[in-house]
Amino acid sequence: DYIKQMDKDLVSEISYESQINMNILREDEDGKVSILDTSTINLSSYPKDNGQETYLEKNYELLYGYYPTNKNEVVLIVDEKNRLDTNILNALGIDVKKNKEIKFDDLIGKEYKIILNDEFYKKQNGHFYVDSSEKNLKKLYNSKNTITISITAILRAKEDSNLSNLPEGISYSNELCNYYIDDCRKSDIVKSQQDSNYNVITGQTLKNSKNKEDEIFEISGINILNNVNQSTTKNQMLSSLGASLLPSSITIYPKDFESKSDIIEYLDNYN
């Protein structure tokens, strides 16, 4: 609410981003399908485009491939020395051998499948579960209802950028993020979780969701990170199911340099 009350003459646009858990499958060269460990690949979303130059074009150098042209194209962020943690590469299905240099061409075009909640989770005896058998994962991977995403660009943060705060790993558009969240909110497992005070997967009782939410803002340039202490609550469970209720970051685009100073002053007065 505090952000929304800001003088609109200072701001050209405000972008809300959410970090969510996605159901993603990968297929290895031998045809084996497995669930991708999204916590390992540092999944993140980048802000919506603002003006003619996109967020990625303005803040990240294109090393290989091309900037995304639609919501199903994702990017791979590397560090200032073009390096990437081997755990990320392994999770993405890239064969990593000791002291072996990975070519950009090995990464561009890699495809993964996002599985929507109603196909991923099955209900039995009042609880939900994931059938992770090889046969079912293969069936899910080949389903016509999947969202196919592909890596189209290798990017590195520009040295002079104040807003290049994406972690090394896979980053997807805010458009894809919102599409996924909207679908998750309509899914059976999320509706069931909203109506239950226990974890609909494990059956464990959830902690009180009415605890005061402590918001912490950190300013990086004009980017604000919003971390909410949710403990093990219903909100946290819903977020893990893709139905994010709160943004993980808010990016404010000032109209000009003077407006930026006024915005920072306004944010400094929070609390």
Q: Which residues fall in each region the model found?
A:
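Basic-flanked hydrophobic alpha-helices used for secretion and membrane insertion
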Residues: D1-N271
